[in-house]
A protein has these predicted regions:
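Non-catalytic accessory regions of SAM-dependent methyltransferases
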Residues: 1-99
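Non-catalytic substrate-recognition/targeting regions of SAM-dependent transferases
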Residues: 83-96, 112-182
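Conserved hydrophobic/aromatic pocket- or pore-lining residues that grip, position, or stack substrates
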Residues: 100, 170, 189, 206
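Carbohydrate-binding surface patches
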Residues: 101-106
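A glycine-rich, Thr/Ser-enriched phosphate-binding loop motif common to dinucleotide/cofactor-binding enzymes
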Residues: 184-188
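Conserved SAM/SAH cofactor-binding pocket of Class I
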Residues: 190-218
Length: 218
């Protein structure tokens, strides 16, 4: 919810980033619960329509459980984007899974404020033993958040991890690579490009881990 679509009084503007608040319409009727970042152009992120629900560990467990059930229907192995922000009911949050390791990008202030609860819920739902925080997103800067990466649970891998996608094996650098280490969101595009590339010569420019090139070769 953009700031120019809201009436923000002095008290609202003084809320700490990440505060959970009730959003009301022009008639002061509750619309839902939002994570507030008063100084950002995205001043509120809708979390829940039911204003009686507590946004905490149990709520996060429910959201993550639903996301996991969907991924397990779609993927045979635990290498995928587990949470894709608003699409999974967790606005501003990206979670990529690499076997027993997850990389979390809490790109919204509300998620940063609930990071301990999110870490516990993620470990409980998925059973992963390593959880890393990637704070390199530009979105965090817009939320007024720091850029400090961290190990939230377990340990960081000492070397890039092999990930099989579209018939090719990619090496995902979870601590030194771009974003979370691999562009899971490009998986369908890699597969589409591979079909177009059959029997052709392909140039993959600015390829990072070789997403399109390796898919074309496979």
């Amino acid at each position: 919810i953009y700031a120019n679509e809201l009436v923000l009084d002095r008290r609202t503007k003084g809320l700490a980033p990440g505060t959970i608040a009730v959003l009301e319409d022009g008639e002061r009727k509750p619309v839902g619960l939002v994570g507030v970042t008063p100084a950002s152009k995205i001043a509120g992120r809708m979390l829940e329509r039911d204003t009686e629900i507590e946004i905490g560990r149990d709520w996060l467990v429910a959201k993550l459980t639903r996301a996991l059930e969907l991924r397990e229907r779609l993927f045979a192995t635990p290498y995928y984007r587990l949470v894709h922000a608003e699409a999974d009911g967790l606005p501003g949050v990206i979670i990529d899974r690499f076997g027993d390791t997850c990389v979390v990008q809490p790109n919204a202030a509300w998620a940063e404020a609930l990071l301990p609860e999110l870490t516990e819920a993620l470990a409980e739902v998925t059973g992963v033993v390593n959880i890393l925080k990637n704070a390199g997103s530009r979105g965090r800067q817009l939320e007024g958040l720091d850029d400090a990466d961290a190990v939230l649970l377990g340990a960081a891998p000492e070397a890039p991890l092999p990930v099989e996608m579209n018939g090719a094996t990619y090496m995902a650098d979870l601590t030194g690579g771009q974003k979370t280490g691999l562009f899971y969101d490009q998986r369908p595009n890699h597969a589409f490009a591979a079909r177009l590339a059959q029997g052709q010569r392909v140039l993959d420019v600015f390829s990072h881990v070789g997403g399109f090139a390796l898919a074309a070769l496979a």
